[in-house]
Amino acid sequence: MTAETRILELRAELDQHNYRYYVLDEPSVPDAEYDRLFNELKALEAEHPHLVTPDSPTQRVGGAALAAFSQVRHEVPMLSLGNAFEEADLREFGRRVVEGLDQPGAVDYSCEPKLDGLAVSLLYRDGQLVQGATRGDGTTGEDISANVRTVRNIPLKLQGKGWPAVLEVRGEVYMSKAGFDRLNAAQAEAGGKTFANPRNAAAGSLRQLDSKITASRPLEFCCYGVGQLSESIGDSHIGILEQLKAWGLPISRELKHAAGIEECLAYYRDIGERRNSLPYEIDGVVFKVNSLAAQRELGFRAREPRWAIAHKFPAMEELTEVLDVEFQVGRTGAVTPVARLKPVKVAGVTVSNATLHNMDEIARLGLRIGDTVIIRRAGDVIPQVMQVVLERRPQDARPVEVPSECPVCGSQVERTQLVKRSKGKETTSEGAVYRCVGRLACGAQLKQAIIHYVSRRAMDIDGLGEKSVEQLVDEGLIGSPADLYKLQFEQVVGLEGFAEVSTQKLLDAIEASKRPSLARFIYALGIPDVGEETAKVLARSLGSLARVQQALPQVLTYLPDIGLEVAYEIHNFFEDEHNQKVIQQLLDSGMQLQDEGELAAEFAASTTLAGMIAKLDIASVGPTGAEKLVAKLDSLDKIIAADGIDLRQALAAKQADAVREFFKDEANQKLARDIEAQLLAFGMHWSSEKKVAEGLPLAGQTWVLTGTLERMSRDIAKDKLESLGAKVAGSVSGKTHCVVAGPGAGSKLAKAAELGVKVLDEDAFVTFLAEQGIAV
């Protein structure tokens, strides 16, 4: 292929990508792929300058404006920046700057994160916002004035005084990670389009023809410079940004000075380490020579300034090929598809696998084996397939099919059924998840179940990592969690990683695990959708394993943060004969649950007959209607037996008819009586004079743990505080009741002193626990 042919190909491909990105709001390749194509074209044109044409993508920035918006000409072009991908690139930039300025000493730079959003221009005349425009092709953009006026942190009128008659502010409109998550959740619930990432969401939201849609989106603005000015407003980049801030315009909180390129590199590394904890997406750091005089001296080249550069982070998105789709089996039997990829480097790490979640996700993506896809990796998150590049689909691409048999144990694979319950009715539909029915007879499920059971936040059996568990299962030594308590010294010693001392330590740890808290034991069972916090709610509210096992789904919904779907997962788990057998085996092994007791006083005190009626989900009867009904008819028997006249004395006609219709159904009568019987058996009393109960001693209080505790772990301390009703927070505020400070306590202790919050050292904390009847 000749250079001219390749140049024409690259221009055509880049033009198509620009059109998809800027006009259709449908990016077709990751930024890293675009950069590679652009740099290849740039290099070829440098080798063959006679082939450079005015319409080449290297001679302009971006793509054409949408015809639906009126066009705006930028008096000062909105140029893009050159890129540095390696430290060597940044050092070379610094060398060129020093050489161009020919000045002694370190050059002063401004440093700020490169937000991943949409570049915009805001024009203020006499302090009033009169125009907003996109970058467009750098010379001509789109008039989005109505839309930028809806972005809440863009001032419609500047604050203070002294601003020039004409002030053009430039910056980035973006969407925070939290805002993006909220938007996608709302879009999914409404059956609308969801977005691949915050950048696409911001661009798509800002370029809506209907500004009401833009106003509903969680957009934010951050300024990074100025364009046309009727008069100077500063002699340095940072000085200008600080002045803009004084006039009410938001600037980056991460804006800093750097003396020389080495300090720039230190800033880049620091931001890189904190990148995933920032509330917004960034794709690099921008460095600018701070002095405006120095900027003027350095000047510009074709499409970028010589005094600024964007130091990009390793790409979070890349293109690669799906070589195959395999299926893995998890702890609950879920058969999950995993994409096997042609290895590619993403965010500095070589990626060869990516999660596909379930078959609904594969259908949503339209994925086939052999497709070229965009994958994304952010921080420690498992790489995900974001999009299929349909233009690159080969003719022999194959559909993904779910195996009919478990790839591990050969048991049947079944599709889950989703049961929706509303207004007393049930509807069933197919779920997105497929499950192996093999339970603990399936090696994959057994291993994952044991790994979860022994984990630190579950039974906390030290010395049993994933490899050790896999070895014990593969050797046939354990076939269920209860088999851990049957292990003998002679069976373990000599296995890989187990000498005599380590074997004895393991057996001691297993023996010590026989005295767990109820919450830890529930969590260790691996009930679907029951995490650590839900396990604590179950233990704290119901007080005993027997009550948790017996609880009806409707009763479980009375507990904090447990909805009906999760309640059915819990109920179905304990109804299952296989699970009952496993639990009984564990109890028979000598398990002694430490904190079993009575029903939580606040739970018993807060559960009323009216509350029970409201939870029955009778059409049009909410909490207020239920209260009125119980005020007139003070028992369930009376409510069930009531005729239309009695009911209409308590409720509006529509509600009364709904109650009567509901209880005509004998199944509903039985359900209501079963719920009441269980609540009464658990210790509830409908008579208010019998319902006086004392709350937990720390109910309503917020405590904070800081430093290293020597007599117990922080997790154990947290469990003990929560058992007394306290909320354990991660930071100190004016609402904090007490701080427990061990050795090494730092900023939290200082904050407590500043706010006058009570502080206990570990000895005082242990004494306090003893006073509450809690041993350490």
Curated annotation (Swiss-Prot):
<dbReference type="InterPro" id="IPR041663">
    <property type="entry name" value="DisA/LigA_HHH"/>
</dbReference>
<keyword id="KW-0862">Zinc</keyword>
<protein>
    <recommendedName>
        <fullName>DNA ligase</fullName>
        <ecNumber>6.5.1.2</ecNumber>
    </recommendedName>
</protein>
<dbReference type="Pfam" id="PF12826">
    <property type="entry name" value="HHH_2"/>
</dbReference>
<dbReference type="Pfam" id="PF01653">
    <property type="entry name" value="DNA_ligase_aden"/>
</dbReference>
<feature type="binding site">
    <location>
        <position position="442"/>
    </location>
    <ligand>
        <name>Zn(2+)</name>
    </ligand>
</feature>
<feature type="binding site">
    <location>
        <position position="172"/>
    </location>
    <ligand>
        <name>NAD(+)</name>
    </ligand>
</feature>
<keyword id="KW-0464">Manganese</keyword>
<feature type="binding site">
    <location>
        <position position="406"/>
    </location>
    <ligand>
        <name>Zn(2+)</name>
    </ligand>
</feature>
<dbReference type="GO" id="GO:0046872">
    <property type="term" value="F:metal ion binding"/>
</dbReference>
<keyword id="KW-0227">DNA damage</keyword>
<dbReference type="InterPro" id="IPR001679">
    <property type="entry name" value="DNA_ligase"/>
</dbReference>
<dbReference type="InterPro" id="IPR003583">
    <property type="entry name" value="Hlx-hairpin-Hlx_DNA-bd_motif"/>
</dbReference>
<dbReference type="GO" id="GO:0003911">
    <property type="term" value="F:DNA ligase (NAD+) activity"/>
</dbReference>
<dbReference type="Pfam" id="PF00533">
    <property type="entry name" value="BRCT"/>
</dbReference>
<dbReference type="InterPro" id="IPR036420">
    <property type="entry name" value="BRCT_dom_sf"/>
</dbReference>
<feature type="binding site">
    <location>
        <position position="409"/>
    </location>
    <ligand>
        <name>Zn(2+)</name>
    </ligand>
</feature>
<dbReference type="InterPro" id="IPR013839">
    <property type="entry name" value="DNAligase_adenylation"/>
</dbReference>
<dbReference type="Pfam" id="PF03120">
    <property type="entry name" value="DNA_ligase_OB"/>
</dbReference>
<dbReference type="InterPro" id="IPR013840">
    <property type="entry name" value="DNAligase_N"/>
</dbReference>
<dbReference type="InterPro" id="IPR018239">
    <property type="entry name" value="DNA_ligase_AS"/>
</dbReference>
<comment type="similarity">
    <text>Belongs to the NAD-dependent DNA ligase family. LigA subfamily.</text>
</comment>
<keyword id="KW-0479">Metal-binding</keyword>
<feature type="binding site">
    <location>
        <position position="135"/>
    </location>
    <ligand>
        <name>NAD(+)</name>
    </ligand>
</feature>
<keyword id="KW-0520">NAD</keyword>
<dbReference type="InterPro" id="IPR012340">
    <property type="entry name" value="NA-bd_OB-fold"/>
</dbReference>
<dbReference type="InterPro" id="IPR010994">
    <property type="entry name" value="RuvA_2-like"/>
</dbReference>
<dbReference type="Pfam" id="PF22745">
    <property type="entry name" value="Nlig-Ia"/>
</dbReference>
<dbReference type="GO" id="GO:0005829">
    <property type="term" value="C:cytosol"/>
</dbReference>
<dbReference type="InterPro" id="IPR004150">
    <property type="entry name" value="NAD_DNA_ligase_OB"/>
</dbReference>
<dbReference type="GO" id="GO:0006260">
    <property type="term" value="P:DNA replication"/>
</dbReference>
<dbReference type="GO" id="GO:0006281">
    <property type="term" value="P:DNA repair"/>
</dbReference>
<feature type="active site" description="N6-AMP-lysine intermediate">
    <location>
        <position position="114"/>
    </location>
</feature>
<feature type="binding site">
    <location>
        <position position="436"/>
    </location>
    <ligand>
        <name>Zn(2+)</name>
    </ligand>
</feature>
<feature type="domain" description="BRCT">
    <location>
        <begin position="693"/>
        <end position="776"/>
    </location>
</feature>
<keyword id="KW-0460">Magnesium</keyword>
<feature type="binding site">
    <location>
        <begin position="31"/>
        <end position="35"/>
    </location>
    <ligand>
        <name>NAD(+)</name>
    </ligand>
</feature>
<feature type="binding site">
    <location>
        <begin position="80"/>
        <end position="81"/>
    </location>
    <ligand>
        <name>NAD(+)</name>
    </ligand>
</feature>
<comment type="function">
    <text>DNA ligase that catalyzes the formation of phosphodiester linkages between 5'-phosphoryl and 3'-hydroxyl groups in double-stranded DNA using NAD as a coenzyme and as the energy source for the reaction. It is essential for DNA replication and repair of damaged DNA.</text>
</comment>
<feature type="binding site">
    <location>
        <position position="288"/>
    </location>
    <ligand>
        <name>NAD(+)</name>
    </ligand>
</feature>
<dbReference type="GO" id="GO:0003677">
    <property type="term" value="F:DNA binding"/>
</dbReference>
<keyword id="KW-0234">DNA repair</keyword>
